[in-house]
From Swiss-Prot:
<protein>
    <recommendedName>
        <fullName>6-phosphogluconolactonase</fullName>
        <ecNumber>3.1.1.31</ecNumber>
    </recommendedName>
</protein>
<dbReference type="InterPro" id="IPR005900">
    <property type="entry name" value="6-phosphogluconolactonase_DevB"/>
</dbReference>
<keyword id="KW-0007">Acetylation</keyword>
<dbReference type="GO" id="GO:0017057">
    <property type="term" value="F:6-phosphogluconolactonase activity"/>
</dbReference>
<feature type="modified residue" description="Phosphoserine">
    <location>
        <position position="49"/>
    </location>
</feature>
<keyword id="KW-0597">Phosphoprotein</keyword>
<dbReference type="InterPro" id="IPR039104">
    <property type="entry name" value="PGLS"/>
</dbReference>
<dbReference type="InterPro" id="IPR037171">
    <property type="entry name" value="NagB/RpiA_transferase-like"/>
</dbReference>
<comment type="pathway">
    <text>Carbohydrate degradation; pentose phosphate pathway; D-ribulose 5-phosphate from D-glucose 6-phosphate (oxidative stage): step 2/3.</text>
</comment>
<dbReference type="GO" id="GO:0005829">
    <property type="term" value="C:cytosol"/>
</dbReference>
<comment type="similarity">
    <text>Belongs to the glucosamine/galactosamine-6-phosphate isomerase family. 6-phosphogluconolactonase subfamily.</text>
</comment>
<dbReference type="GO" id="GO:0005975">
    <property type="term" value="P:carbohydrate metabolic process"/>
</dbReference>
<dbReference type="InterPro" id="IPR006148">
    <property type="entry name" value="Glc/Gal-6P_isomerase"/>
</dbReference>
<dbReference type="Pfam" id="PF01182">
    <property type="entry name" value="Glucosamine_iso"/>
</dbReference>
<dbReference type="GO" id="GO:0009051">
    <property type="term" value="P:pentose-phosphate shunt, oxidative branch"/>
</dbReference>
<feature type="modified residue" description="N6-acetyllysine">
    <location>
        <position position="180"/>
    </location>
</feature>
<comment type="function">
    <text>Hydrolysis of 6-phosphogluconolactone to 6-phosphogluconate.</text>
</comment>
């Protein structure tokens, strides 16, 4: 079977340079969207190491645009663990503490799960909130989704060989058997990921090198979840550091301030 197009691959000499470039891209994408006909910017964030990276770089990158621009941002989360917001595993909780305290997006435009609901109801509730925020879209269309990828090839809470990879109707799905703790989560589904205008995968460190080679170069009969993210009309980009990219033989753009 033919391999899908890997998208634009950018490799940075360090995770610090990657983070700075990512923040600038978010700021530029926001400015472009806010200047357009819709005059809003919809951003979907993932957790993990992205929290500290964006917390370090994004406030300064978007500061020149001023708080009036942030008032037109809509922020959602690509997946979430079903834990209280003050729990160390809460993606929203970590962003609230480390980023949103310095990025004054109106609270009404930050779309979160209700962690007090059972996981199935939490997924339905989050889907309802997304549909309200994206009125006019048959499926929520994010201007920019920032995704991570696990050493096993998972992205969001979409894990290898899991039935959720076949989900085509729901925009948000519950998962109660995550192979990575905590087991109960809520995740965007592939139809939403592939409807986005721009998707950026971010991966750093040698621990990601082998799986990135599989995703970006191998022609697998049973593709890993991250390889199934192929935006229908949007752009797909990969931001990697040198350690994560060390096994790649496909063409990529090398970025360095040296």
């Amino acid at each position: 079977m033919a391999a899908p197009a890997p998208g634009l691959i950018s490799v940075f000499s360090s995770s610090q340079e990657l983070g700075a470039a990512l923040a600038q891209l978010v700021a530029q994408r926001a400015a472009c969207c806010l200047a357009g006909a819709r005059a809003r910017f919809a951003l979907g964030l993932s957790g993990g190491s992205l929290v500290s990276m964006l917390a370090r770089e994004l406030p300064a990158a978007v500061a020149p645009a001023g708080p009036a621009s942030l008032a037109r941002w809509t922020l959602g989360f690509c997946d979430e663990r079903l834990v209280p917001f003050d729990h160390a595993e809460s993606t929203y909780g970590l962003y609230r503490t480390h980023l949103l305290s310095r990025l004054p997006i109106p609270e009404s435009q930050v779309i979160t799960i209700n962690p007090e609901l059972p996981v199935e109801e939490a997924a339905e509730d989050y889907a309802k909130k997304l549909r309200q925020a994206f009125q006019g879209d048959s499926i929520p269309v994010f201007d920019l989704l920032i995704l991570g990828v696990g050493p096993d090839g998972h992205t969001c809470s979409l894990f290898p060989d899991h039935p959720l990879l076949q989900e085509r109707e729901k925009i948000v799905a519950p998962i109660s058997d995550s192979p990575k703790p905590p087991p109960q989560r809520v995740t965007l589904t592939l139809p939403v990921l592939n409807a986005a205008r721009t998707v950026i995968f971010v991966a750093t460190g040698e621990g990601k090198a082998a799986v990135l080679k599989r995703i970006l170069e191998d022609q697998e009969e049973n593709p890993l979840p991250a390889a199934l993210v192929q935006p229908h009309t949007g752009k797909l980009c990969w931001f990697l550091d040198e350690a994560a990219a060390r096994l790649l033989t496909v063409p990529f753009e090398k970025h360095s301030t040296l």
